[in-house]
Every structure is written in structure tokens, then in C-alpha cells.
Amino acid sequence: MDYWDDWYASKAATPTVGEIMNRHLGLPPGLLAGVVPAEAIPELTTGLRLEPGDTLLDLACGRAGYGLTVAQGSGAGLVGIDVSAEALAQAREQAVRLGVTDARFHVGDLTASGLPDGSADAVLCTDAIQFPDDPSAAYREIRRVLKPGGRVALTSWEPVDRDDERLSVRLRRVDLAAGLAEAGFMRIEVRERPAWLERERAIWEEAVTIDPGDDPALISFHGEGVRSLEHLALIRRVLAVATAP
């Protein structure tokens, strides 16, 4: 996946972006993560109900900052799956830095992880469920790899109005409760987290003040800030947890 490999490589070459994001999100300096804030990590960990020795699948893990943190805090082993080999290379380096020894990373995607049926005790997927062309296939894949009674925790954005054409089609179709229910999950909870969105707002407000020059990562960060500020009022920030049958 050349686009994602290039994207992650540019972020690694320009640590300024991560420094700004982590400062607003309350994440530790140097943690390679996304836009889920620090206060979400205990909630994700609790929702996944991991025990020492369990297997946590971090699906579409990117550089696996969240999966590694949850695994480290719970004593679980981690399997990270992503389409980007570059992201996984950075994830492996991060696992070493964090001292997480039971962590494996493989190329795969949300709809075809390559893992055996029932091989995970829990699945974490942060801010990626919107990417597949067939979202229902992603929910089915999560159910397939989970053991009976296994837990899933998802974070994403949902539209305030699904008919609002100012939002991308990918975002307009995100419906965590419906997707999980269609795949057969039970005890589904979707929780709105507006405070997370305000942290994102602070990131993007700083991003648009930056002169990116010719730095690819800063150009991307600045542009994402402009687009995101236009749409923040149109979306809600959500976390979902559910149990496999």
C-alpha cells in the first residue's frame, strides 16, 4: 500500500506532528498513536476485559500505540494487523522501546486479517472501521477471529445527519451499533465522547497555524486540519463495545 507506507514514513521523518497531537491528547511524549486521547485507554482496557496471557488483536493497528499500551497494561499478548508494512516496521520498533515482548505484527486488512477462526480473546480497532469498501465485511471479520464471548472495542466518528453530503460517503455510512448487530454481536454499547472531539479541535486549530513549507508530513497535517475544522460540527465521537456470541 504505497499511499499508507509513504504517509507513515513522512510522519516518522517529521516528529513535530506527533508531538503536537500527543500534547493535546494527553498521551506520553514519543508514543506513536492516533487521535484517540489518553483518557480513552482505561475505558478501552476495561471494555476488552483482558486477562494476562490473553491474545489481543489490534486490527488496522497502524503503529500500534494503543494496542501496545492496552496489552502492556493488561498482560495480554498482542497481534497487530495493518495494510502498511512501513507502519508495522514502526510498530515493531515501538514494541521494543516500550518493552512489550509478546507482540507480533503481520500485513493484512480489516476484512482479511489472515488469522485463524476464534484466535483472539479481544479485538481493538481505533478509528479505522470506515475504510473498507464493504464495512459489513470488517464487522464479520472481527466476529470470525474472536473466540465465543470475546470482546471488541471500536472507536470512530458517526454523522450527526447521515444525509449530510458535506461529509464523505465513508463517514456517512458509519453506524457502529448497526454494523455490530448485523454481524451477530451481543450486549452492544455505543457511547458518545464529545470531550474527545474537543481535543481533536485543539489539534486542528494548531495545525492550521503551521507554515508547512515543503515538508510532506506538515503539508498533510495542515490540510487535514483545514478539512477537519470544516466538519467537526457534523460528526460525533463514539466508542463501542460488544461481545461475540
Model-found features: residue ranges?
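Class I SAM-dependent methyltransferase SAM/SAH-binding core
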Residues: 57-59, 63-112
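A short SAM/SAH-binding and catalytic strip from SAM-dependent methyltransferases
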Residues: 122-134
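Conserved alpha-helix/loop element of class I SAM-dependent methyltransferases that forms part
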Residues: 34-52
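N-terminal, positively charged/glycine-rich alpha-helical extensions of SAM-dependent methyltransferases
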Residues: 1-24
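Conserved Class I S-adenosyl-L-methionine
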Residues: 189-245
